[in-house]
Amino acid sequence: KTDFDGTMKALVDIGYKRMEAAGYRDGKFYGKSPAEMKKYLADLGARMVGSHTGSGLLAEGDTKGWDFWKKNAADTAEVGCKWIVQAGYPSKDIKSLSDVKRLADQFNKCGEIAKANGLRFAFHNHVDEFHELEGKIPFDVMIENTDKGLVTFQIDTAQLVYGGFKCHDYVNRYPGRFANWHLKDANADGKGSTEMGAGIVDFKSIFGVAEKAGLED
């Protein structure tokens, strides 16, 4: 937050040259236009491959909400990304399984918009979507009600543990649906993250199901 340029240079210097953003606001990435950010990263020897973004559950006929997604996808494509990622579950908007299915329909439409811009759409999991609702796990409902050709899921390995599940369990249940991963380790109490290898996430078993998951990035 205090030294963006220094942080980016340090990341590139230690070998991180494929970046994922989480700072799209008002048509800009961390205050830079898509063209400016693309050049900025290229000058560092890096590129942006994905962008975390998102919206709540859109109401029927919410043209402003869909205009946001269309502009967002166009900007994300312009900056050079492959992935546009809904980063989180809008739990405040979800009161029933019907709402979860509406969200899945929304993701399918986001996937269509992404595809039209040469992108892939993904959903990044946190914890709330693993809390049972009307006898079902919302995360499962989202997977089962989205089009495999339009929507993939970005597994956050630590957040799965926080939710009481394991990565390989989901991969075995829904093969080919997890093309993008966030590799994070979880503390023994399951309440915070730690350095990879220092926690309780079983990375050996996770890497063993990478092909079955459909992992690309």
Segments the model singles out, each with a brief description of its role:
Residues 1-82, 115, 176:
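N-terminal pre-domain/capping segments
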Residues 4-7, 33, 37, 69-72, ...:
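Stable alpha-helical elements in mature extracytoplasmic
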Residues 1-15, 80, 133-155, 159-217:
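Histidine-acidic metal/acid-base catalytic patches
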Residues 20, 50-52, 85, 122, ...:
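Conserved beta-strand positions in the central sheet of alpha/beta enzyme cores
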Residues 18, 58-152:
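Active-site acidic/histidine proton-transfer and metal-coordination neighborhood
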